[in-house]
Amino acid sequence: MLPAHKQTLEALLADSVKQVAHALKGADAATVAPVITLERPKVAAHGDVACNVAMQLAKPLGTNPRQLAEQIVAALTAQPGAQGLVEAAEIAGPGFINLRLSAAAKQAVIAAVFDQGRAFGTSDREKGKQVLLEFVSANPTGPLHVGHGRQAALGDVLANVIASQGYAVHREFYYNDAGVQIGNLAISTQARARGLKPGDAGWPEAAYNGEYIADIARDFLNGETVAASDGEPVKGTGDVEDLDAIRKFAVTYLRREQDMDLQAFGVKFDQYYLESSLYSEGRVEKTVDALIKAGMTYEQDGALWLRTTDEGDDKDRVMRKSDGTYTYFVPDVAYHVTKWERGFTKVINIQGSDHHGTIARVRAGLQGLHIGIPKGYPDYVLHKMVTVMREGQEVKISKRAGSYVTVRDLIEWSGGAAAGQEAAPDLIDEATITRGRDAVRFFLISRKADTEFVFDIDLALKQNDENPVYYVQYAHARICSVLNELKSRYNVDVAQLPGADLSQLTSAQAASLMQKLAEYPDMLTHAANELAPHAVAFYLRDLAGEFHSFYNAERVLVDDEAPRNARAALLAATRQVLENGLAVLGVSAPAKM
């Protein structure tokens, strides 16, 4: 039901409970604190709304739950405010209160959608609050792989979901541009620049083997200039002995490549934060010194240890190794201090499940600083790995990266690019990229983050109801076609439909579709509260299913004006909610397919 109706019904039920409690307990009724929870029954025949408050309060009020439910229903239906909202009420099982909403209450969603348009489903309840959402945060050592793609989809959609509740969302990408892997990137590029290739004598053991390393080396030798979206241009010097120049060029080159990956995926960030800046600005040293002064560290075997067990970790952790270098979680602590200092009291990190072990360490470090950061800061959403399948076989390599499938591979393949075409980007048109982006974004958000995901390229290419993104987009396109035909055949424009006589919508299929439309705002709120962006994809598949059921049951383009316009109004509202939900997913809503 619509949020406004839900709030009204909750208030009416709470008032009814108070009346009954007072009648049973007198002055002692003030101690009764009901929790009114409204849910949609799993079986449609049981009504539109179910409430278990009678079973909650039967014992405190010293009565039978079914009898209590009957008294609550009697009090509820006697209230003037309920008479236009509730059509019928019945008691089920041990004391469930099942309510049927009035036809007018169900139909109200159509007017709400027409009135609010693209804003339908959104809320300003969190207006004035801000959230920092960090995601992707890949090392600039290669193209983005499919795991990064899942993280990008989760992060971007979750950002949209949270923003729908009024939050100001700051999207941030943390570049791990310092450390051993960056050194490996530099020596890999240097080896390629010297004419070596994987398998040759002298090829570094820790080197990256993808063909992209050869591309970097070629451009470095040719004196090409590269630039990331937020950085200064870097020119290749061609000096194969200058490892620092090679490192700088290679990192910038790959940051540019990752920028292009993200652009193809439709993901934008507000800020890119460089790990190297934490060192150059002295933030890592400052954080370590503060932990030492706070008594959170000790020396052992030439290393500096953090007392993470004080904050619930299973053992203390090394911060600074005996060779003077820091372990990887230390700059993470310093980085999160900057998030707090920048005023972000709510922070969400999206990471692979293989990073689970760092959570306790980072939180322990933050708590050990005693600067007011609350326990449990930051929040985490952990996701599991993605397996790519094509023609029944797992795909493990690509021409771009060598040892893994990249995000751009996945987008191009899912858009219909033939195997091998990814090596010739001039053959990939914008329509292919759009189809691929839509499929990849929808697929990667269509499962809970904590479940492993098998991405089936063949399924992404199917144009039938087995393909979930096609199924949802086709529902939108089909409605657009019907509304165009309505204009062509009957000269009825969508702008005229808010005046339709909605009392014509009497079928079970129409009622079920209206109920599903009304659930959209609460679904978004739930998805934001639970950090569950997959809920949007689940909802859209269900909504498309309800639409198809209605459309198959009732003809819309009939000569009788009243039922025709009422059914068309319901379709127009459904089209708007499909568009709104697809926009949250960052997926297009085509008018034709």
Swiss-Prot record:
EC number of the protein: 6.1.1.19
Oligomer and partners: Monomer.
Gene Ontology cellular-component terms listed: cytoplasm
Residues in the signal sequence: none
Protein name listed in UniProt: Arginine--tRNA ligase
Reactions catalysed: tRNA(Arg) + L-arginine + ATP = L-arginyl-tRNA(Arg) + AMP + diphosphate
Recorded family membership: Belongs to the class-I aminoacyl-tRNA synthetase family.
Protein keywords: Aminoacyl-tRNA synthetase, ATP-binding, Cytoplasm, Ligase, Nucleotide-binding, Protein biosynthesis
GO molecular function: arginine-tRNA ligase activity; ATP binding
The keyword Protein biosynthesis is assigned to this record: yes
Pfam family, one: Arg_tRNA_synt_N
GO biological process annotation, one example: arginyl-tRNA aminoacylation
Source organism superkingdom: Bacteria
Location in or out of the cell: Cytoplasm
Motif ('HIGH' region): 138-148
InterPro entries xref list: aa-tRNA-synth_I_CS (IPR001412), Arg-tRNA-ligase (IPR001278), Arg-tRNA-synth_N (IPR005148), Arg-tRNA-synth_N_sf (IPR036695), ArgRS_core (IPR035684), DALR_anticod-bd (IPR008909), Rossmann-like_a/b/a_fold (IPR014729), tRNAsynth_Ia_anticodon-bd (IPR009080)
Enzyme superclass (EC): ligase
